[in-house]
Amino acid sequence: MLTSISADIMEKLKILSDAAKFDVACTSSGASRSGNGNDMGSAFASGICHSFTADGRCISLLKILFTNECIYDCKYCINRCTNDVERVTFTPEEVCNLTVEFYRRNYIEGLFLSSGIIESPEHTMQLLYTTLFLLRNKYHFNGYIHIKGIPGASSEVLEMIGYLCDRMSVNLELPTAEGLRAVAPNKVRKNILTPMRFIQNGIKDSRMYHGNSSMRNRMYIDEQAYYEQMAEIKDSTARLSEYHRSLRVATECGKADKLAEKSWGLGEQLDPEFVCETTDVSYGAGDYINNTGLSIKRPDRYYVPAGQSTQMIVGATGESDYQIISVAEAMYNRFDMKRVFYSAFVNVNMDESLPGIGQPPPLKREHRLYQADFLMRFYGFKAGELLSEDNQSFNDYIDPKCQWAVGHLECFPVEIMTADYYTLLRVPGIGTNSVRRIIKARKHAKLSFTDLKKMGVVLKRALYFITCDGRMMYNTKLDESYITRHLIYNERPDTMLLADNKSYTYEQMSIFDFISE
């Protein structure tokens, strides 16, 4: 029978949960695992995150650091070794006790565990491995676990811990290796990218061993949905690929890819059988696991079944939005990332060498990056389409999809009754669910704008870019400035009416704009 949570553990929890608040982990689990009658807890693929704080962060995971002690001196981190803060460390048993007690009280549905660096990356990962082993095998906790991989730990311990967690993430930290050297001098580019490659290969091998297609496992909960979707968009995917191969688009996308390579040296060959550069312990993970008896039967489990993710800090260094999304795209394409998270920089240390002192964090910029990220993951966009060398920032007043659309009016208007899957997805105001409803419904009847509204299409954005049976909703002119002004007014009328021409580029709407409709 479990004991109640002691006051000492609760005091540690107060300190270490506060220290973990800048780690971003607001996602559903991505892994399905029902209860088996013997263990406690379960994981569900479509959303263990039910509750969010006011700033949008998920609170259904117990999100803590194992310790806030650290041997590194990263300028952006509150736990840097030169900061005078109270230092505390959990034991593996304490983390297990907290997780199980909170789960039984229905406070949480999973665990997000990160850590500062105690002694060395290898020693820290060994402690995290012990914690997860006890949770899974002694306390029989079957819920969702997201673990932070520590750059510099050995492949041995990363392999073993990957069979105990659902998701593992190694933080990229900054969009460029140059930025990393400037603000986190103790962290090495190779020690970040190499474990990412190791985890990627481990996930691929594990899924092949269990007979699962990597794409099907990542994108769809059941096989029927997978094959229905593939049949539906097969021709559309071919047309999208042809569009991406066109000279203008391919040139811009090639520039974005080269920018990502330059930012992090992603073109270099990485050795998955790596030896970490910063480890300084008397024996490795294999000796540690053998000596403690904390070994597991690896083939019985999936390796990191919910995939790996990473995180970039936005606004700590001078990278543009174009550079950030180019690196994110490379992470998805070259490392099979499940998610790339973006965290608006907060200068918690009031470091004069970093921006943001006395200023709010760039939350709007973070939001725009997430919107662009979704366009790349689900809507068929590439980084080189959304931004370019000539236009390296997202618009503050309209979302990235609208920004792309008003800059590519030659692609519009789109006929709702005949356009293919990915063409419809590029229309502002039309999402993935709406596209599926449209394609299904138009087989049986002609669709009207009223029908589209019932299907979830946001007409205040879409009406400028679509026709139904050859007709637009209003007599709208396809003019970039005209449409942009209307989009801004629809989203933020207070801002638009108060804007002056010099500060905001776009003109205030006149009575003639309304008359022309």
Which ranges hold each PLM region?
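Canonical Radical SAM [4Fe-4S] cluster-binding loop centered on the CxxxCxxC motif
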Residues: I64-E93
